């Protein structure tokens, strides 16, 4: 019985050990590709590590990536997209804010950041971002829809009170 228990424990823990090893190996490949100047390959390896262990991949980004390098924006975008897909809006917002620090007038990034704020329940901050988007791009559909709906609902609430 004891042998059988040990067998099952080792059987179930083996994939965890292999997963950790493969994440480390992939992150080493990311580092090697960055050092070799192969940014496209580095982003590809980085993207492959995210589903294996997103927390370890994020830690790699914060500790090993030069935030002033060209590739840091691409890696931050990958993490932002992954967290958005997992509906972890707090982390996605964090990475979109990181991207906005480098390019504060990037309309696409502002739009997604505002969307994350709505998902996080931060409508006032989203309102400010959508207003900034309209200053940069008056024809932005998402900003016009959000602001139109927001001001309509505010007027309706004011009528009721």
Model-found features: residue ranges?
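Conserved structural position within tetratricopeptide repeats
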Residues: 51, 67, 98-101, 131-135
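Helix-start (N-cap) detector for alpha-helical repeat units in TPR-like alpha-solenoids
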Residues: 23, 57, 73, 107-108, ...
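Single-residue signature of alpha-solenoid repeat helices
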Residues: 42, 92, 126, 160-161
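Canonical tetratricopeptide repeat
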Residues: 61-64, 74, 78, 112, ...
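Short coil/turn linking the two alpha-helices of tandem helical-hairpin repeats
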Residues: 57, 121, 153-159
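Register position in tetratricopeptide repeats
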Residues: 35, 85, 119-120, 153-154
């Amino acid at each position: 019985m004891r042998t059988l228990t040990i067998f099952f424990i080792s059987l179930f823990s083996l994939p965890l050990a292999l997963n950790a090893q493969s994440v480390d190996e992939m992150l080493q490949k990311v580092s090697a590709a960055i050092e070799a100047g192969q940014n496209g390959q580095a982003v590809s390896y980085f993207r492959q590590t995210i589903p294996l262990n997103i927390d370890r991949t994020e830690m790699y980004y914060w500790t090993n990536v030069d935030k002033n390098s060209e590739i840091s924006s691409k890696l931050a975008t990958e993490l932002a997209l992954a967290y958005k897909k997992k509906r972890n809006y707090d982390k996605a917002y964090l990475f979109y804010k990181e991207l906005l620090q480098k390019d504060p007038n990037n309309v696409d990034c502002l739009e997604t950041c505002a969307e994350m704020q709505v998902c996080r329940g931060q409508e006032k901050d989203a309102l400010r971002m959508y207003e900034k988007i309209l200053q940069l791009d008056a024809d932005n559909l998402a900003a016009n829809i959000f602001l139109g709906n927001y001001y309509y609902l505010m007027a309706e609430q004011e009528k009721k009170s």
